[in-house]
Amino acid sequence: MNGVEVPAKIQKRIERLRQEINDHNYRYYVLSQPTIPDSVYDELFHELEKLEKKYPETITPSSPTQRVGAEPLKVFEPVHHEIPMLSLDNVFDEKGLRAFDKRIRQRLKLDKPFEYVCEPKMDGVALSLLYENGELIRAATRGDGYTGENVTQNTRTIASVPLQLRGNDYPELVEIRGEVLMPREGFAKFNREAEKRGDKTFANPRNAASGSLRQLDPRITAKRPLIFYGYLIGLLKGKDFPKNHCDVLKWFKDWGIPVISEIKVVGGIEGCLDYYEHLVKTREKMPFDIDGIVIKVNSLQVQAELGFVSRAPRWAIAYKFPAQEKMTVVKAIEFQVGRTGAVTPVARLEPVSVSGVTVSNATLHNFDELYRKDVRVGDTVIVRRAGDVIPEVVGPILAKRPKKAKLIKIPSRCPVCHAEVIKPEGEAVARCVGGLYCRAQLRESIKHFASRRALDIEGLGDKLVELFIQEKLIKDITGIYQLKKSAITALPRMGEKSAENLLTAIEKSKKTTLPRFLYALGIRGVGDTTARTLARHFHELDLLMKASIETLQEIRDIGPVAAENIHAFFHQKNNAELINKLIHLGVHWPQEKAVVKSEIAGKTFVLTGALKSLTREEAEEKIERSGGKATSSVSKNTDYVIVGENPGSKYEKAKALGISLIDEEAFLKLLKS
């Protein structure tokens, strides 16, 4: 039909069908008030499909028929979250919730109660939807909060996600965050059908939702009964934020975004407690799994004032439901070795279903916990999913203990490398002293060394690391920089192109910064913030390596334990040799310069939008090297917000709080100062 003009009557019918189908989706998913049976909906949809097939020039990306049809992907592309997708802090009892309320009122200097919004804590997968001029242009998973995966094609297949927002009162750019769920009924049906076909079944609806969203073939996702609910705005451009969070949810409904119906605005913490008790009693009647309630400050102005701490907002909290418990038997107690050498006892259990999840392993945390609880092999124990998530052994039922129950001792030798295991007096954790020559520690150390916040070696994932160690291609972290193309291509599923890409990423990682290098070394207690602090203080690696414990303790934010760990690390011969070898192999960084009367020193900066001359990480590192602090969220403690192209909601929050806004040119001038 190419080149043939579409009759006006047909064009009008196509537009009418699209409008009707979108309206019925809105009534079904947003209002929960369907007005036609499924059979009639299917007839409308099939009529539209036939017309679009006959007149393909009428097809638009936002047509309801275009949810499925993309080619299978080879890989999910990474997506950087301009505003981090942070998780929430948790409380598990009334005392914890009251403490949260008290902290907020003290911070705001308020004696009287104020408004909270309470909503069920959905047990699904966090998802970010980006709409430009009302059209869905990107969907991304949370990932680590800073970088997620592009799952746009899969998300388009979820019928409750509008491809085009309703009405015309939407902003130029808006990021809608929410949760993807698989309802219980759909989950049960999916598993029944999978079982009949002999296919893999899922342990619980959350795993099913996650697995469905991460299918490389969107046609598979399209067959899964997924639903999306919105609960938050991230980026916003071309429209001012409303006053309250509940107004945001009203926007969502108006735009055709489903919002969970069991949301309530309450006055003060007593109302939150009442809401919690109500949901504890009614949770099983809900169509999908929830694992607690979420409490948010209703006022967006107050949210901006409260800001964030570490990886969570101060203005919201998750109040988790009581843990669910079951009995099972301990078949064995084995030992796992972590990156820092910590030897952790793990209980191997007779599989038992707890809150819909099959639990066969549970951590015993450390040997002090193991002996305090007196858990033995052969014991009948109570297993709990704390917060419906982490399997934990609560303790043994002594009345059921068999005579041959076996008490486990701390191993004298590492189960992986057979080096000595020591447990210093007063410490709960036993450690393998094998260091980076222990295969288990080596594996975890290499994964850490290559991670995004460390040397950022793209493509060096868990399975590849394990394979390199297994094939003895890497014997310590310096082995990364001695890999040969011929050795890589000889491995299963590693072709020429894959090997070239990996070697390019490894070569690129040689140029780094001192804070990243220090973090990559995996020193106990040294996260990326402490690494930046050390780099700012010493400027040179040699000076840090020679520093005494007393010198280290004089640095702000470095406590006695961290000082001892840092000192011990650099005074171990093996570690010093590895560092020298890495430098000899080409790992390098610009020297950290001492800060002299910088206008940036002591100031806190937040970036929003894209800068032309610098990447976000380059800008943050320049701020840190100049003695300033770069954070990811705006609060009343922020001194400057640097505004690049297409700024997000941080810009609006900064304006609301009266924080200094500077453009890229002004920021570069500050750097030169």
Curated annotation (Swiss-Prot):
Keywords, A to Z, come to:
DNA damage, DNA repair, DNA replication, Ligase, Magnesium, Manganese, Metal-binding, NAD, Zinc
| Cofactor(s) listed in the protein's UniProt record | Mg(2+); Mn(2+)
Which positions bind NAD(+)?
A: D38, S39, V40, Y41, D42, S87, L88, E119, R142, E179, K296, K320
Q: Which reaction does it catalyse?
A: NAD(+) + (deoxyribonucleotide)n-3'-hydroxyl + 5'-phospho-(deoxyribonucleotide)m = (deoxyribonucleotide)n+m + AMP + beta-nicotinamide D-nucleotide
Question: CDD domains given for it?
Answer: BRCT_DNA_ligase_like, LIGANc
Residues involved in Zn(2+) binding: C414, C417, C432, C438
The active site lies at K121 (n6-amp-lysine intermediate)
What GO MF terms are annotated? DNA binding; DNA ligase (NAD+) activity; metal ion binding
What InterPro entries does its record include? BRCT_dom, BRCT_dom_sf, DisA/LigA_HHH, DNA_ligase, DNA_ligase_AS, DNA_ligase_CS, DNAligase_adenylation, DNAligase_N
Q: What is this protein called?
A: DNA ligase
